[in-house]
A protein has these predicted regions:
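Transmembrane signal-anchor helices characteristic of membrane glycosylation enzymes that use polyprenol
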Residues: 1-22, 107-109, 157
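Short helix- or helix-capping micro-motifs
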Residues: 3, 99-109, 129, 133, ...
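Extracytoplasmic catalytic/substrate-binding loops of multi-pass membrane glycan-assembly enzymes
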Residues: 15-31, 43-55, 64-65
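Transmembrane alpha-helices of multi-pass, membrane-embedded glycan-processing enzymes
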Residues: 48, 52, 56-64, 70-84, ...
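Short acidic/glycine- and proline-prone juxtamembrane loop motifs at membrane-interface regions
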Residues: 48, 113-124
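Transmembrane-helix signature of polytopic, membrane-embedded enzymes
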Residues: 83-108, 125-126, 144-146
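Membrane-interface transmembrane helices that cradle and orient dolichyl/undecaprenyl
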Residues: 91-95, 129-147, 157
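Transmembrane helices and adjacent periplasmic/lumenal helix-loop junctions
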Residues: 148, 152-165
C-alpha cells in the first residue's frame, strides 16, 4: 500500500512543481539533448554522470520537452530509491513493522525532494541501496552470480554519479 501512495504522491508532486528546478537540471537536460541527437563530442564529459541524461533520452526521442523529460527521469529515480531502500531494509533482516515504517517515511519524503531537483542523487542512492542490500547477503562471497550482480549495480551507481566510486 505504501508504494501506491508513494507513486501517487511522486506523480502529483511532479505535476504540481513542473517549473521548479535546480541549476544542475539545465546541464543534465542539455547533455540529454546531446545524447539524443548523437552529438557524442558534447555528450561525453568528465564531470556529469551519464545515467540521468540517458534516462531522459527516450522521452526526448518521443518529442517530450526537456523539462518534462527531466521530471520523468526524477520520477523513475524516486522509484529506484524507494525500492532500493526497502530492499536494503529487507536484506538486513529488520522486522516487518520496521519495513512498513521505512516505506511510509519514504513515501512521504521522496516527493518533496524529487519535485524540486533534477539531479542524480536519488538515483545513485537507490542503486547504492540495492548494491548494499546484495552485499549484506550471507551468500555474497559464495554466490558468484550475487557478487557479479552487486558489482554491476555499483557500476550503474557510478554511471549515475561518480561519488559511488
Amino acid at each position: 500500500m505504501a508504494w501506491v501512495v508513494a507513486y501517487a504522491l511522486m506523480l502529483n508532486s511532479m505535476l504540481n512543481n513542473m517549473q521548479q528546478m535546480n541549476t544542475d537540471a539545465i546541464a543534465y537536460m542539455r547533455i540529454a539533448e546531446y545524447w539524443s541527437s548523437g552529438n557524442l563530442g558534447f555528450a561525453v564529459n568528465g564531470y556529469w554522470g551519464p545515467m540521468l541524461s540517458w534516462l531522459m533520452v527516450p522521452f526526448l526521442w518521443l518529442g517530450v520537452e526537456p523539462l518534462l523529460a527531466g521530471k520523468l527521469a526524477m520520477l523513475f529515480s524516486g522509484a529506484i530509491f524507494f525500492h532500493g531502500s526497502l530492499f536494503l531494509v529487507r536484506s538486513v533482516g529488520l522486522r516487518l513493522v520496521d519495513e512498513l515504517i521505512v516505506a511510509w517515511v519514504l513515501a512521504l519524503t521522496i516527493p518533496g525532494w524529487m519535485s524540486n531537483h533534477v539531479t542524480p542523487d536519488l538515483l545513485v542512492a537507490g542503486l547504492m541501496a540495492f548494491a548494499l542490500g546484495q552485499a549484506v547477503s550471507p551468500d555474497w562471497l559464495a554466490n558468484r552470480r550475487r557478487a557479479l550482480g552487486t558489482g554491476a549495480t555499483w557500476g550503474l551507481a557510478y554511471l549515475a554519479k561518480a561519488v559511488a566510486l
